[in-house]
């Protein structure tokens, strides 16, 4: 890369800047170290820094060159430090007859030493001395550092002589790595050269295994800390898996092992092909571009590509929307594909290190496994061998001779429980062009693949290796389209392909009984569907395979399943089941979380969709795996309880156990059952209480809860309390129930939900009942926050106290909400198009109003308040949150208990709710339906 390409003269003109400082010094009356002179020098350097950075940003916006930008910013810093150091040693603290000790080399180390910087990067400097520090040296170092700090730079520094550098490099791997990147800046070049020679002879030589082992272990620890997958949707560009640090690690170990100065030398040595070198350079350039843009956009050393800055970075890089994917999603997909390329390069270089050079370095193989070179054949044709507990190819041409071997490699690894030899993976990666239409339709290849996918061992591990190598996306091109695809929202934590692999991992854990405490129903059901277990694995691999297309991914995915399943060897009946499961994979979750499961029509409609117990079982397990694999914290006990309730209620319909008794008959039975449980009450008091609740209460609430409510209301009446709350933790369901007894009025639920929001409670469900004497008995469920019931009860009682204070007028709700209405920073990056649907077919008794919008503190209170203002009674509310998006369903009637059937009134309700949802919101960028986005 030439200076002409870099256009360095547009960044800073070194001679002009040097001349300007000298002219200032020549005309100054003060001492060069005086405060006025120091201010002048500082301002001159700061102006040059600001101008150079601005020019670098402008050039980045024009040419898009990430590596160019990093080198330009590094040149800017080199120039400023060189001129500053010259001023310090010739003007501020000159030496007329310097001794040998009054000498110094200024050296860039660490990231700065590698020759690339982003705007906010640390500037790591080594003040290299020939002997011990001198008073002159202390003055120069102090002057230089304070000027750099006052320029606003983050400077890391050390002052050492050569002996100290060598001793510390021997003891500390971090210091050794920093010196490996050492680059001369200014001062005594011979001194620096002496350090280089001694570092090579005394530190590097003979310690290659030690260094490489340490760097790979350091990388693994960093990945564990940042997140094992390279597909986290808010990646750390510098430290994350597949990020810049991984590229640095690769170059460190090759530089240390092969004694190279540039990546180009690795091609001459046969470590990388020219295509792989090009891949390395492209990955490096892209990551530098992203990181430089992040620093420029945020005006700080921002390394995490968080949701709130992703749109701006995507725009800066020039991404545009395509059908089915917005510009942010296209950018992040490109990012993850680059991260995957970095993983490929890691495997290639590790293979070269182990196989090409290990024999030259005693003990090198200990880095990877053991000295043992025992080999055994794994296949009759001798194509594969087991070597050090890893599968390897016996000959370099086995994939070309029989492309089915590209699938057989993974099948054998699974069957024998082997890791993969780097040489085999390198050969595989370089043979991907062999995967063509003939191989995809090959019956043996598909038989082997289905056995891998449905393996009773650990299918996720092998599929992950297939995906990382590129084989999975080539063998199933539809899968290849969703590799590295992200969805720009706060709900999905992983890319689509990563989510699918994690779904398969969850299913395998359920099948092995590892999740029986958390998922008892799924754990039981999996043992009853042995004949259909393969269908679940196939469905989980395919259920989101059509994401990123303009149409509903469930419908498009079902078509893909219909095409692929016969190829995998499934029968027509099995194909039909998988196709149905893919098409309906969101249905059970949607019904469980956003519909009233106490409403009989909800259950009957869902049973009509499912039709058979076999499908119900498969759909329940599929839904559990799908939700649990979305990301940490998405699954909770409340969702599990909703799914179990829906399963059991639907099972009754499908098996003929669902009672068709009239409402009146069921109401009579329920009152009689409660009367029996309250038999110790005086008859007059018992009869009076049984007359309080309306029919809907008895048909909805469990008998145990009815008994608890009866004692709750009785105690309140005996104490003369019109307003009272009660808390009950439900540990397994991960919710806490707060029951509120209060005089009924139209906006009561709005006040309760608002008070709950003000107290920090996250409402997931609400049931609203009134009594015949004009009171309301409302039950809200809030997400569990604590591990122990005692802590959770105290928190719930605090929320209940806030509710009581607000309802009694002791606290002012608007003031309390105002303190919590600022949305989360990440949520501000998103737009969710407001949506309101009014449906009279989902319930026989109620109109269902479903609203969707951008979540914000207090939104539920605003919605319920507006619904009350529109003269509607809310019977139940069901709250579902998908990251930044909320979908709330309200079961309502008018004030006389009728559905809302008038079209004009429906239009007015919809218009006002849309206006409320639209406040502080805009049009959603992806334009997907709520189901499609889930």
Curated annotation (Swiss-Prot):
Keywords on record: Hydrolase, Magnesium, Multifunctional enzyme, Nucleotidyltransferase, Repeat, Transferase
Reported cofactor(s): Mg(2+)
- What is stated about the way this protein's activity is regulated? Uridylyltransferase (UTase) activity is inhibited by glutamine, while glutamine activates uridylyl-removing (UR) activity.
Region annotation Uridylyltransferase: residue ranges? 1-379
- List the catalysed reactions: [protein-PII]-L-tyrosine + UTP = [protein-PII]-uridylyl-L-tyrosine + diphosphate; [protein-PII]-uridylyl-L-tyrosine + H2O = [protein-PII]-L-tyrosine + UMP + H(+)
Q: Which SUPFAM superfamilies match?
A: ACT-like, Nucleotidyltransferase, Nucleotidyltransferase substrate binding subunit/domain, Poly A polymerase C-terminal region-like
| HD domain ranges (all copies) | 496-613
> Where does the record place the ACT domain?
737-818, 848-931
Keyword flag Transcription: no
Transmembrane stretches in the record are none
Query: Which GO terms of the molecular function aspect are on file?
Result: [protein-PII] uridylyltransferase activity; phosphoric diester hydrolase activity
The similarity annotation says: Belongs to the GlnD family.
Cited function = Modifies, by uridylylation and deuridylylation, the PII regulatory proteins (GlnB and homologs), in response to the nitrogen status of the cell that GlnD senses through the glutamine level. Under low glutamine levels, catalyzes the conversion of the PII proteins and UTP to PII-UMP and PPi, while under higher glutamine levels, GlnD hydrolyzes PII-UMP to PII and UMP (deuridylylation). Thus, controls uridylylation state and activity of the PII proteins, and plays an important role in the regulation of nitrogen assimilation and metabolism.
The record's note on its domains: Has four distinct domains: an N-terminal nucleotidyltransferase (NT) domain responsible for UTase activity, a central HD domain that encodes UR activity, and two C-terminal ACT domains that seem to have a role in glutamine sensing.
What this protein is called in its record is Bifunctional uridylyltransferase/uridylyl-removing enzyme
Species name for this entry?
Brucella ovis (strain ATCC 25840 / 63/290 / NCTC 10512)
Q: Which gene encodes it?
A: glnD
């Amino acid at each position: 890369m030439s200076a002409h390409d870099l256009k360095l003269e547009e960044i800073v003109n070194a001679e002009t800047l040097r001349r300007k400082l000298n002219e200032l010094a020549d005309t100054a009356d003060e001492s060069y170290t005086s405060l006025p002179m120091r201010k002048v020098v500082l301002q001159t350097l700061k102006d040059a820094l600001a101008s150079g950075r601005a020019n670098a940003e402008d050039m980045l916006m024009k040419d898009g060159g990430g590596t160019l930008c990093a080198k330009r910013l590094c040149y800017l810093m080199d120039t400023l430090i060189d001129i500053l150091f010259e001023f310090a040693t010739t003007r501020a603290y000159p030496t007329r007859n310097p001794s040998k000790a009054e000498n110094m080399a200024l050296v860039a180390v660490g990231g700065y030493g590698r020759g690339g910087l982003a705007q906010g990067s640390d500037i790591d400097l080594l003040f290299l001395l020939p002997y011990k520090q001198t008073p002159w040296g202390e003055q120069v170092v102090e002057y230089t550092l304070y000027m750099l700090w006052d320029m606003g730079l983050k400077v890391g520094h050390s002052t050492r002589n050569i002996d100290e550098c060598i001793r510390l490099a021997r003891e500390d791997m971090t210091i050794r790595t920093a010196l490996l990147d050492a680059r001369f800046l200014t001062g005594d070049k011979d001194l620096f050269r002496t350090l280089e020679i001694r570092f090579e002879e005394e530190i590097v030589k003979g310690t290659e295994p030690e260094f490489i082992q340490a760097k790979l272990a350091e990388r693994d620890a960093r990945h564990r800390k940042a997140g094992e997958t390279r597909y986290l949707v808010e990646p750390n560009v510098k430290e994350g898996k597949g990020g810049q640090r991984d590229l640095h690690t690769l170059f460190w170990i090759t530089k240390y092992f092969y004694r190279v100065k540039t990546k180009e030398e690795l091609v001459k040595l046969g470590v990388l092909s020219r295509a792989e070198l090009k891949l390395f350079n492209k990955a490096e350039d892209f990551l530098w571009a992203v990181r430089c843009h992040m620093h420029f956009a945020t005006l700080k050393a921002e390394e995490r590509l968080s949701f709130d800055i992703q749109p701006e970075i995507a725009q800066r890089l020039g991404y545009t929307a395509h059908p089915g994917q917005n510009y942010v999603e296209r950018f992040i997909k490109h990012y993850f594909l680059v991260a995957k390329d970095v993983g490929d390069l890691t495997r290639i270089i590790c293979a070269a290190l182990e196989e090409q050079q290990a024999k030259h370095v005693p003990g090198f193989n200990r880095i990877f496994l053991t000295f043992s070179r025992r080999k055994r054949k794994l296949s009759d044709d001798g194509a594969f061998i087991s070597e050090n507990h890893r599968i390897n190819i016996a000959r370099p041409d086995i994939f070309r001779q029989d492309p089915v071997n590209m699938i057989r490699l993974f099948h054998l690894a699974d069957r024998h429980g082997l890791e993969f030899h780097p040489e085999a993976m390198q050969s595989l990666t370089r043979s991907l062009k062999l995967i063509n239409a003939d191989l995809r339709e090959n019956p043996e290849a598909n038989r082997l693949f289905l056995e891998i996918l449905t393996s009773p061992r650990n299918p996720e591990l092998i599929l992950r290796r297939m995906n990382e190598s590129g084989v999975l996306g080539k063998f199933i091109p539809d899968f290849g389209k969703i590799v590295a695809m992200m969805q720009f929202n706060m709900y999905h934590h992983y890319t689509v392909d990563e989510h699918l692999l994690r779904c398969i991992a969850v299913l395998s854990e359920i099948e092995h009984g590892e999740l029986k405490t958390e998922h008892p129903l799924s754990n039981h059901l999996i043992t009853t569907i042995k004949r259909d277990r393969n269908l679940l694995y196939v469905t989980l691999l395919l259920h989101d395979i059509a994401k990123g297309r303009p149409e509903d991914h469930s419908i498009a995915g079902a078509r893909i399943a219909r095409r692929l399943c016969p190829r995998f060897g499934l029968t027509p009946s099995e194909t039909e089941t998988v196709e149905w499961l893919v098409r309906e994979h969101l249905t059970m979750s949607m019904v469980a979380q956003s519909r009233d499961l106490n409403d009989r029509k909800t259950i009957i409609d869902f049973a009509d969709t499912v039709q058979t117990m076999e499908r119900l079982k498969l759909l329940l397990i599929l839904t559990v795996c799908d939700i649990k694999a979305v990301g940490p914290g998405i699954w909770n006990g409340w969702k599990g309880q909703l799914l179990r309730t829906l399963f059991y209620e639907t099972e009754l319909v499908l098996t003929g156990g669902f009672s068709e008794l009239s409402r009146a008959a069921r109401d009579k039975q329920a009152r009689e059952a409660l009367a029996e449980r309250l038999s110790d009450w005086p008859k007059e008091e018992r009869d009076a209480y049984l007359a309080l609740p309306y029919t809907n209460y008895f048909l909805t609430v469990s008998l145990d809860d009815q008994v608890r409510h009866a004692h709750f209301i009785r105690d309140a009446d005996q104490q003369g309390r019109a307003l009272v709350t009660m808390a009950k933790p439900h540990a397994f369901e991960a919710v806490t129930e707060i029951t509120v007894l209060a005089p009924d009025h139209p906006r009561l639920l709005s006040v309760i939900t608002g008070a709950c929001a003000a107290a920090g409670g996250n409402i997931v469900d609400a049931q609203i009942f009134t009594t015949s004497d004009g009171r309301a008995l409302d039950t809200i469920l809030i997400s569990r926050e604590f591990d122990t019931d005692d802590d959770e009860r105290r928190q719930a009682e605090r929320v209940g106290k806030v509710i009581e204070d607000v309802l009694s007028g002791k606290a002012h709700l608007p003031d309390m909400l105002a303190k919590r209405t600022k949305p989360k920073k990440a949520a501000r990056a998103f737009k969710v198009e407001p949506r309101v649907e009014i449906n009279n077919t989902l319930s026989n008794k109620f109109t269902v109003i479903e609203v969707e919008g951008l979540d914000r503190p207090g939104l539920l209170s605003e919605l319920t308040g507006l619904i009350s203002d529109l003269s509607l009674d809310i019977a139940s509310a069901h709250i579902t949150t998908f990251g930044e998006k909320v979908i709330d369903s309200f079961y309502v009637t008018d004030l006389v208990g009728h559905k809302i059937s008038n079209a004009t009134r429906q239009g007015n309700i919809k218009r006002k709710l849309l206006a409320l949802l639209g406040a502080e919101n805009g049009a959603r960028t992806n334009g997907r339906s709520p189901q499609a986005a889930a």
